[in-house]
Swiss-Prot record:
Assigned keywords, A-Z: ATP-binding, Cell membrane, Membrane, Nucleotide-binding, Phosphonate transport, Translocase, Transport
Principal subcellular localisation of the protein: membrane
Family: Belongs to the ABC transporter superfamily. Phosphonates importer (TC 3.A.1.9.1) family.
E.C. code: 7.3.2.2
Subunit annotation: The complex is composed of two ATP-binding proteins (PhnC), two transmembrane proteins (PhnE) and a solute-binding protein (PhnD).
Annotated source species: Staphylococcus epidermidis (strain ATCC 12228 / FDA PCI 1200)
Entry's localization field: Cell membrane
Name of this chain's protein: Phosphonates import ATP-binding protein PhnC
Chain's role: Part of the ABC transporter complex PhnCDE involved in phosphonates import. Responsible for energy coupling to the transport system.
A GO molecular function held by the record: ATP binding
Catalysed reaction equations from the record: phosphonate(out) + ATP + H2O = phosphonate(in) + ADP + phosphate + H(+)
Classification via NCBIfam families: ABC_phnC
SMART domains: AAA
Pfam name, any one: ABC_tran
Amino acid sequence: MSQIEFKDVSKVYPNGHVGLKDINLNIEKGDFAVIVGLSGAGKSTLLRSVNRLHDISKGDITIEGQSITKARGKKLLEMRRSIGMIFQHFNLVKRSTVLRNVLSGRVGYHPTWKMILGLFPKEDKVKALDALERVNILDKYDQRSDQLSGGQQQRISIARALCQEPTIILADEPVASLDPLTTKQVMDDLKKINEELGITILINLHFVDLAKEYGSRIIGLRAGELVYDGPASEANDEVFNHIYGRSIKDDEKLGVE
């Protein structure tokens, strides 16, 4: 049984734009799967449909054999606990401390009123500190998040996702706003988490070099359709040209040196 399965999934927006068209795709446990394609190809729509940030129009998506598409209420909350999310723009509470931001990864486990009052049990704080140590910013735990660099803020986001104790992490263009050196550090963190903890990574990336360097698998989308799914080791220039429908530009190859 695949960890994530897309079954005939389509997404049509209210304005008639087709975001996804008849997607059939299996993501296996432990994959580091990179989604690539032009802007507007459906990468974010595909990624965000996994945890229902975007609802699909047709088909079904299952997590560990259970339909998240049909899940409601407590069942949906329970399924979302296992899916961490990392965004391009970090989505941190800038005035809060690093530790408090990471602890927000535990909100799905406790009543809302306790989270508003900051009543996190000791066990949660231990989990949060462990997550910060894993991404090498434990020493920043008591600083305000907006006092840190972009790369450090993205590492807070990764730690927050880890604090959730997920089996899957979705990463939506997590390095798009970072410089090359910081990009490498963040991608190294994600790869280490994938390899050491066995957490499945499903990630959107703009740079094809990064996709080949870090991915175990490449998923190519064009105009909402799945046009490639195969090992990263087999994804050569011809494959990427097919995915993009044209030759790859230099600024799409800028990756880790």
